[in-house]
Amino acid sequence: NDIMTRMFGYFLSWMQEKTSSVYVIATANNAHNLPLELKRKGRFDEIFCVNLPNEDERKKIFKIHIGNKKQNLDEAALNSVSLITEGFNGADIESLVNEAVEKCFIDSLDNKGTAFDERLLKDIASKTVSITKSCKKQIDNMKKAFKENNFKDATTGKITT
């Protein structure tokens, strides 16, 4: 902990005293735990929050993970599963796709022939506990911190309200 304190102090001094243009990009899973000295004006020009993906973003995430697994889903099915997965983050969606592919594979070994399709994804999604349900309190606290600190939404570029 002593080393972290010294490194943090050194980092803050460096940020304050640097003489050339430097871009510092940092991430944090919990803005509440960031030290006040790091959040004060002048340390970072912009602070963004990355919210849960909206419907269009979820659709893009589905396309990526479905493509990575060499599967296909038509546009209407993509729209449908993107709509019903509100509150899912990228990891939730990846897990959903992985589970569907795994089910298709296991069923193929048993000659059941389960198809990778909208119905299968919806069935798995209905049984999936998304991060917004399993970590509701923490997510609500993070959203509160976004508002209190006037963080900008990374998708829209607007102050979180």
List PLM regions with ranges.
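C-terminal engagement/docking regions of AAA+ P-loop ATPases
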Residues: 25, 80-95, 105-161
